[in-house]
């Protein structure tokens, strides 16, 4: 039986799920200085040569998103803490349980009564997390990393890339020492990333619904993802308040920041030390 299953699996045609690469992947990555000038070439990690799998990226995103869901339940005695009983049959009234009292007390306990129990309350044991295999998860992350290197995928996601010299955008390690927002803005302008930050700033809108009262007043589009080599890099404090910008250490890369909404192709700024660290990760 197992051999038949394996045989059928090997005969599966995965071509509909593997997107053809829109252009030839670059084997060398261009490194730019803080002033935006070309500095050198470095060998591209294998992650950037991975086939792009939107189906796996979407699946990994839903798995990571559902892992945040909080189990919900209700108090077992909710709606049942009343002294009530049914009057029985033969009185020309519904057999619904009623409060004890004079005349015809109102109904209680039943789901269709005021203050009664819920018919189908949320269960704590309900499975909320969509599981994913470890190898699938790593493959999805590598595929999402590869999508950041293609201008067509990044532009299709809505990012402004007209002034970006090349993708992926890699900057020298000295950029991680920047600790002022003014200097970080100059870096973004030199690399052609600032127009995308302005796009995110213009897209900030007030949320519809009750979320406004619950600490989620504004909806903000995603713009540039900055990947650094270390969480202690001063650059993190310099750029974290830019509209739509996320900063993450390379060893903490995840599908939620690489493909927000499950859509690959986020505009990403890599530092050269982060690219070197990436070579041994998610393989």
Swiss-Prot record:
The lineage of its organism: Archaea, Thermoproteota, Thermoprotei, Thermoproteales, Thermoproteaceae. One of its GO terms (biological process) is translation. Belongs to the universal ribosomal protein uL4 family. Part of the 50S ribosomal subunit. GO terms for cellular component: cytosolic large ribosomal subunit. The keyword RNA-binding applies. This is Large ribosomal subunit protein uL4. One of the primary rRNA binding proteins, this protein initially binds near the 5'-end of the 23S rRNA. It is important during the early stages of 50S assembly. It makes multiple contacts with different domains of the 23S rRNA in the assembled 50S subunit and ribosome. Forms part of the polypeptide exit tunnel. NCBIfam families: rpl4p_arch. SUPFAM superfamilies: Ribosomal protein L4. The keyword Signal does not apply. Gene3D superfamilies: 3.40.1370.10. One of its GO terms (molecular function) is structural constituent of ribosome.
